[in-house]
Amino acid sequence: MSNISFDLAITSPLKRAKETAEILLEGRKIPLLEDERLAEMGFGCLEGYYCKGEKMNIPDPKFHYFYDDPACYQAPDGGESFKELLKRAKGFLADLCEKKAYENKTILLSTHGAMLRALLDTVKGIGVEQFWDSGVQKNCAVSVIEIKDGIAKVIEEGVIYYDDEVEDW
């Protein structure tokens, strides 16, 4: 991605996304802004548990709705629902589409799995019922959204620029 001329970068304030953006921008004089709306979906009292695969250790038997039926998923105490996540994504995208300062700019966004899915699904008009239908992208997968005349369109989704032997989360 070193051949892409970014005008600006916006990152989640969470460490993993911020460090990824800093690595991609290393040696470039590109502003890096933090935006809380790009943070990962909040899991409240379930933060820190593994939520997928053999390591899954979430004690709530209803958590399977998170992947199997997002419309029925109920956020844990202090957590965030899919509707809340999608609302955050929609607000962020509205700002990208409407702010003149972002017009005709190439902007790097560094975020997290569920938020990225929310951004892409919002652009494609997909609701909570089909939230995961396009799958979970691999870590550091690249998606491209183009905004023209205030309308967002997904151009590429889930492109990998590294050896694909990295373990899925």
Predicted regions and their residues:
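Phosphate-coordination/substrate-recognition cap region in phosphate-metabolizing enzymes
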Residues: 1-64
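Glycine-rich phosphate-binding loop signature in dinucleotide/nucleotide-binding domains
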Residues: 2-5, 96-105
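Short beta-strand scaffold positions
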Residues: 11-12, 87, 110-111
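Amphipathic, non-transmembrane alpha-helical scaffold segments
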Residues: 14, 82-90
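Active-site catalytic microenvironments for nucleophilic, acid-base chemistry
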Residues: 23, 27, 95, 99, ...
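Acidic, low-complexity terminal tails and accessory targeting/binding regions
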Residues: 41-55, 102-105, 121-169
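Short glycine/proline- and acidic residue-enriched helix-loop micro-motifs
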Residues: 62-84
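GST superfamily/GST-like fold recognition
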Residues: 113-117
